[in-house]
């Protein structure tokens, strides 16, 4: 029987380890928030199976849903490992739902990107910007700035994940706020921006929306560069990644 731990992955990416049993799932290990369409988890889980022999099923929770599940299962843990945004990893460590774990080369991770005890650590990072399906714009110019997204021509074409639940949504809200002149102690600029953006009827899903961008359902998504480049170079879609001019 496999010892459970949860180590979480953040957008800087953390891993989290836990104790529990997974026999009811018929799997070797359980990972929360390992969606096949995010950060190429599909390929990663195949490589884990190939090189380590562990069969780990996909899981489509977002960061907030993952933390909620860990808290609900605190006394009877199910997951072995969890992946989520760094802020959720910090909370998980504070709430006592993860065990300390230090993988090989833990000491090489910069101090600001890990918990000293190993309750969370970063495994990758991403640059946030616009993941744009050029064909789905139907001739409209590719937006270059946060301000561009407020133009009426993009009504119904913009999406961002729910900031209250998904880490990438929270990261997007923080990025907008900083670009508009705010900081972590003053979110008014970001709040005012999203009030204006609401006039363009944005789509606000809770789960990763990679496939919805490629299909054209969401032409413009606040997302990370690694998802956009996967669409461009692996799935050969006519997509671009834009870093907003305001930063």
Where in the sequence are the language-model features?
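General small-molecule cofactor/ligand-binding pocket signal
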Residues: 57-59, 202-204, 240-242
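A ligand-binding cleft/hinge motif common to bilobed small-molecule-binding domains
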Residues: 87-93, 214, 219-238
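Sec/Tat signal peptide C-region and signal peptidase I cleavage site
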Residues: 21-26
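Short hydrophobic/aromatic-enriched beta-strand-loop microsegments
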Residues: 99-103, 238-244
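Hydrophobic helical h-region of N-terminal Sec-dependent signal peptides
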Residues: 11-19
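Early extracytoplasmic/lumenal segment of secretory-pathway proteins
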Residues: 27-91
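Bacterial N-terminal signal peptides that target proteins for export
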Residues: 1-11
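Extracytoplasmic ligand-binding site segments that recognize negatively charged/polar headgroups
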Residues: 34-42, 78-215
